[in-house]
């Protein structure tokens, strides 16, 4: 996993060049957006339990068969595993938004996830719905301007959306 700074330095080093003014400008933009990025990560982390719990409740309200006898989230140990998995995905999305890069999400969370769920008989489409619900909650938090530095957060929200979409697509 390389952060944006390491990538830029590695690119310049591979060419045997100093950082260009364009690369320096890009890094300056990253620094300027850093507080918003960290605020978003902090909001997600501070609300992780509620994000996961509320998303699971919404999923089970839409798909009650999952939590009933014979469902993939029944009995309680399977429900706990479901909540744990949702929390892991959310945690890795928060790492990706902090790093500004999806490689940690891809490498440590998503690679092989579809195959694991298939082997367990877990419906990937239901997992994708849960991830989309976490996405909605996280984007709502990211868009909450209360206590966030002034400025446009649309690119950060779009980036956050991409990470959740990537996670949802990886399980179906």
Swiss-Prot record:
GO CC, alphabetical: chloroplast thylakoid membrane; phycobilisome
InterPro entries linked to this entry: Globin-like_sf, Phycobilisome_asu/bsu, Phycobilisome_asu/bsu_sf, Phycocyanin_b
Residue positions where N4-methylasparagine is found in the record: 72
CDD domains: PC_PEC_beta (cd14768)
Main localization (coarse): plastid
Record bears the keyword Chloroplast: yes
Reported modifications of this chain: Contains two covalently linked bilin chromophores.
Superkingdom of the source species: Eukaryota
Xref: Gene3D superfamilies: Phycocyanins
Membrane topology type: Peripheral membrane protein
Phosphoprotein as UniProt keyword: no
Ligand binding ((2R,3E)-phycocyanobilin 2): 153
Gene Ontology terms describing biological process: photosynthesis
Recorded family membership: Belongs to the phycobiliprotein family.
Assembly information from the UniProt record: Heterodimer of an alpha and a beta subunit, which further assembles into trimers and the trimers into hexamers. The basic functional unit of phycobiliproteins is a ring-shaped hexamer formed from two back-to-back trimers contacting via the alpha chain subunits. The trimers are composed of alpha/beta subunit heterodimers arranged around a three-fold axis of symmetry. The phycoerythrins also contain a gamma subunit which is located in the center of the hexamer.
Protein name, UniProt field: C-phycocyanin beta chain
Lineage, highest ranks first: Eukaryota, Rhodophyta, Florideophyceae, Rhodymeniophycidae, Ceramiales
